[in-house]
Amino acid sequence: MEHHKTYHAKELQTEKGSVLIEGPISPEKLAEYEFHDELTAFRPSQKQHEALIEIAGLPEGRIIIARFRQTIVGYVTYVYPDPLERWSEGNMENLIELGAIEVIPAFRGHSVGKTLLAVSMMDPQMEKYIIITTEYYWHWDLKGTNKDVWEYRKMMEKMMNAGGLVWFATDDPEISSHPANCLMARIGKEVSQESIERFDRLRFHNRFMY
Protein backbone atom coordinates (compact mmCIF):
# COMPACT_ATOMS: atom_id res chain seq x y z
CA MET A 1 0.00 0.00 0.00
CA GLU A 2 1.29 3.46 -0.86
CA HIS A 3 0.99 6.02 1.90
CA HIS A 4 0.51 9.36 0.17
CA LYS A 5 0.90 12.36 2.46
CA THR A 6 -0.70 15.65 1.44
CA TYR A 7 0.10 18.73 3.53
CA HIS A 8 -2.80 20.76 4.93
CA ALA A 9 -2.85 23.69 7.35
CA LYS A 10 -5.33 25.78 9.29
CA GLU A 11 -4.75 28.91 11.34
CA LEU A 12 -6.37 29.06 14.76
CA GLN A 13 -6.80 32.35 16.63
CA THR A 14 -6.35 32.12 20.41
CA GLU A 15 -6.05 34.78 23.10
CA LYS A 16 -2.32 34.01 23.18
CA GLY A 17 -1.94 34.59 19.45
CA SER A 18 -2.22 32.69 16.21
CA VAL A 19 -1.48 28.95 16.18
CA LEU A 20 -0.84 27.09 12.93
CA ILE A 21 -2.15 23.53 12.78
CA GLU A 22 -0.27 21.78 9.97
CA GLY A 23 0.87 18.47 8.61
CA PRO A 24 1.85 15.83 7.83
CA ILE A 25 5.24 17.35 8.69
CA SER A 26 8.52 15.94 7.34
CA PRO A 27 11.23 14.73 9.77
CA GLU A 28 13.51 17.53 8.53
CA LYS A 29 10.94 20.24 9.30
CA LEU A 30 10.15 18.71 12.70
CA ALA A 31 13.84 18.81 13.62
CA GLU A 32 14.01 22.53 12.77
CA TYR A 33 11.25 23.58 15.17
CA GLU A 34 11.55 24.09 18.91
CA PHE A 35 9.65 21.49 20.95
CA HIS A 36 7.90 22.93 24.02
CA ASP A 37 9.33 21.57 27.28
CA GLU A 38 5.83 20.96 28.71
CA LEU A 39 5.10 18.26 26.13
CA THR A 40 5.96 15.49 28.59
CA ALA A 41 2.83 13.29 28.81
CA PHE A 42 4.59 10.26 27.30
CA ARG A 43 8.31 10.87 27.92
CA PRO A 44 10.69 13.80 28.54
CA SER A 45 10.16 16.48 25.88
CA GLN A 46 13.51 16.02 24.13
CA LYS A 47 12.93 12.27 23.83
CA GLN A 48 9.39 12.85 22.58
CA HIS A 49 10.68 15.27 19.93
CA GLU A 50 13.10 12.57 18.75
CA ALA A 51 10.28 9.99 18.71
CA LEU A 52 8.10 12.25 16.54
CA ILE A 53 10.95 12.82 14.07
CA GLU A 54 11.37 9.04 13.83
CA ILE A 55 7.61 8.45 13.28
CA ALA A 56 7.49 11.16 10.59
CA GLY A 57 10.15 9.24 8.66
CA LEU A 58 8.15 5.99 8.57
CA PRO A 59 6.24 5.25 5.34
CA GLU A 60 2.87 5.26 7.13
CA GLY A 61 3.87 7.66 9.93
CA ARG A 62 2.11 11.02 10.19
CA ILE A 63 2.70 13.91 12.53
CA ILE A 64 0.32 16.87 12.60
CA ILE A 65 1.54 19.75 14.79
CA ALA A 66 0.22 22.87 16.46
CA ARG A 67 2.87 25.55 16.08
CA PHE A 68 3.11 28.87 17.91
CA ARG A 69 5.74 30.88 16.00
CA GLN A 70 8.65 28.41 15.76
CA THR A 71 7.62 26.25 18.74
CA ILE A 72 5.57 23.05 18.63
CA VAL A 73 2.89 23.35 21.35
CA GLY A 74 0.81 20.31 20.40
CA TYR A 75 0.82 17.29 18.11
CA VAL A 76 -1.00 14.15 17.08
CA THR A 77 0.68 10.97 15.80
CA TYR A 78 -0.52 8.27 13.40
CA VAL A 79 1.49 5.08 12.99
CA TYR A 80 1.02 1.32 12.67
CA PRO A 81 -0.02 -0.28 15.99
CA ASP A 82 2.65 -1.63 18.32
CA PRO A 83 3.60 -5.21 17.27
CA LEU A 84 2.77 -6.35 20.83
CA GLU A 85 -0.85 -5.13 20.61
CA ARG A 86 -3.71 -7.19 19.23
CA TRP A 87 -4.43 -4.48 16.63
CA SER A 88 -1.28 -5.49 14.74
CA GLU A 89 -2.17 -9.20 14.69
CA GLY A 90 -4.02 -9.03 11.39
CA ASN A 91 -1.04 -7.31 9.69
CA MET A 92 -3.55 -4.94 8.14
CA GLU A 93 -1.67 -2.43 6.01
CA ASN A 94 -4.66 -0.07 6.04
CA LEU A 95 -5.10 0.02 9.83
CA ILE A 96 -3.22 2.83 11.58
CA GLU A 97 -3.35 4.05 15.14
CA LEU A 98 -3.77 7.54 16.49
CA GLY A 99 -1.09 6.83 19.06
CA ALA A 100 -0.72 10.11 20.93
CA ILE A 101 -2.26 13.55 21.11
CA GLU A 102 -0.89 16.23 23.40
CA VAL A 103 -1.34 20.00 23.83
CA ILE A 104 0.52 22.14 26.38
CA PRO A 105 -1.67 23.48 29.25
CA ALA A 106 -1.46 27.11 28.06
CA PHE A 107 -3.21 26.24 24.79
CA ARG A 108 -5.84 23.86 26.14
CA GLY A 109 -9.45 24.99 25.90
CA HIS A 110 -8.82 26.67 22.52
CA SER A 111 -9.94 23.75 20.31
CA VAL A 112 -6.31 22.94 19.43
CA GLY A 113 -6.88 19.20 19.93
CA LYS A 114 -10.06 19.20 17.84
CA THR A 115 -8.34 21.18 15.08
CA LEU A 116 -5.34 18.80 15.08
CA LEU A 117 -7.81 15.99 14.36
CA ALA A 118 -9.79 17.97 11.78
CA VAL A 119 -6.63 18.92 9.84
CA SER A 120 -5.44 15.28 9.99
CA MET A 121 -8.59 14.17 8.18
CA MET A 122 -8.29 16.76 5.38
CA ASP A 123 -5.88 14.42 3.55
CA PRO A 124 -7.89 12.20 1.12
CA GLN A 125 -5.49 9.35 1.97
CA MET A 126 -7.24 9.05 5.36
CA GLU A 127 -10.32 7.65 3.56
CA LYS A 128 -8.25 4.56 2.73
CA TYR A 129 -7.55 3.74 6.41
CA ILE A 130 -9.22 2.32 9.45
CA ILE A 131 -7.90 4.70 12.11
CA ILE A 132 -8.10 3.49 15.70
CA THR A 133 -7.25 4.94 19.07
CA THR A 134 -7.24 3.19 22.43
CA GLU A 135 -8.11 5.35 25.41
CA TYR A 136 -6.82 4.24 28.82
CA TYR A 137 -7.74 6.37 31.82
CA TRP A 138 -4.29 5.90 33.39
CA HIS A 139 -2.76 7.93 30.52
CA TRP A 140 -4.99 10.94 31.15
CA ASP A 141 -3.73 14.17 32.67
CA LEU A 142 -6.54 14.48 35.23
CA LYS A 143 -4.49 16.73 37.52
CA GLY A 144 -3.99 19.32 34.81
CA THR A 145 -7.72 19.65 34.14
CA ASN A 146 -9.52 19.25 37.51
CA LYS A 147 -11.82 16.75 35.81
CA ASP A 148 -12.83 13.34 37.11
CA VAL A 149 -12.36 10.22 34.98
CA TRP A 150 -15.82 10.42 33.41
CA GLU A 151 -15.65 14.14 32.61
CA TYR A 152 -12.24 13.59 31.00
CA ARG A 153 -13.53 10.59 29.02
CA LYS A 154 -16.42 12.73 27.72
CA MET A 155 -13.97 15.47 26.71
CA MET A 156 -11.72 12.94 24.92
CA GLU A 157 -14.70 11.45 23.07
CA LYS A 158 -15.83 14.89 21.88
CA MET A 159 -12.33 15.68 20.69
CA MET A 160 -12.02 12.36 18.82
CA ASN A 161 -15.49 12.92 17.30
CA ALA A 162 -14.04 16.08 15.69
CA GLY A 163 -11.86 13.74 13.63
CA GLY A 164 -14.73 11.37 12.87
CA LEU A 165 -13.65 8.72 15.40
CA VAL A 166 -16.51 7.03 17.24
CA TRP A 167 -16.82 4.42 20.00
CA PHE A 168 -16.48 0.74 19.03
CA ALA A 169 -17.07 -2.29 21.25
CA THR A 170 -14.23 -4.75 21.90
CA ASP A 171 -13.36 -7.61 24.24
CA ASP A 172 -9.71 -6.48 24.52
CA PRO A 173 -8.76 -7.27 28.17
CA GLU A 174 -6.91 -3.98 28.81
CA ILE A 175 -9.78 -1.90 27.48
CA SER A 176 -12.34 -4.05 29.30
CA SER A 177 -10.42 -3.71 32.59
CA HIS A 178 -12.05 -0.32 33.35
CA PRO A 179 -15.36 1.08 32.06
CA ALA A 180 -13.79 4.47 31.23
CA ASN A 181 -11.32 2.86 28.81
CA CYS A 182 -12.49 2.60 25.23
CA LEU A 183 -11.68 1.84 21.62
CA MET A 184 -12.55 4.52 19.08
CA ALA A 185 -12.20 4.26 15.33
CA ARG A 186 -12.87 5.94 12.01
CA ILE A 187 -13.49 3.74 8.99
CA GLY A 188 -12.57 5.60 5.80
CA LYS A 189 -15.02 5.77 2.89
CA GLU A 190 -12.70 3.70 0.66
CA VAL A 191 -12.14 0.84 3.12
CA SER A 192 -13.36 -2.51 1.75
CA GLN A 193 -15.95 -4.73 3.43
CA GLU A 194 -13.25 -7.41 3.75
CA SER A 195 -11.06 -5.01 5.79
CA ILE A 196 -14.01 -4.07 8.00
CA GLU A 197 -14.64 -7.77 8.72
CA ARG A 198 -10.95 -8.30 9.54
CA PHE A 199 -11.16 -5.36 11.94
CA ASP A 200 -14.27 -6.92 13.56
CA ARG A 201 -12.29 -10.12 14.14
CA LEU A 202 -9.51 -8.11 15.80
CA ARG A 203 -12.04 -6.38 18.05
CA PHE A 204 -13.56 -9.64 19.25
CA HIS A 205 -11.42 -12.66 20.03
CA ASN A 206 -14.31 -14.28 21.94
CA ARG A 207 -16.55 -15.00 18.99
CA PHE A 208 -19.77 -15.26 21.01
CA MET A 209 -19.56 -11.51 21.60
CA TYR A 210 -19.24 -10.77 17.90
UniProtKB/Swiss-Prot annotation:
Biological process, per Gene Ontology: acetoin catabolic process; butanediol catabolic process; cellular response to glucose starvation; cellular response to nutrient levels
Matching InterPro entries: AcuA (IPR024699), Acyl_CoA_acyltransferase (IPR016181), GNAT_dom (IPR000182)
Annotated coiled-coil segments of the chain: none
Disruption phenotype: No visible phenotype on growth in medium containing glucose and acetoin or in medium with acetate compared to wild-type. After glucose exhaustion acetoin is quickly consumed similarly to wild-type. In the late exponential growth phase slightly more pyruvate is produced compared to wild-type.
Domain N-acetyltransferase stretches: 19-189
Record-linked Gene3D superfamilies: 3.40.630.30
Annotated keywords: Acetoin catabolism, Acyltransferase, Transferase
GO-annotated molecular function: acetoin dehydrogenase (NAD+) activity; acetyl-CoA synthetase acetyltransferase activity
EC numbers for this chain: 2.3.1.-
This protein's pathway: Ketone degradation; acetoin degradation
Protein name as annotated: Acetoin utilization protein AcuA
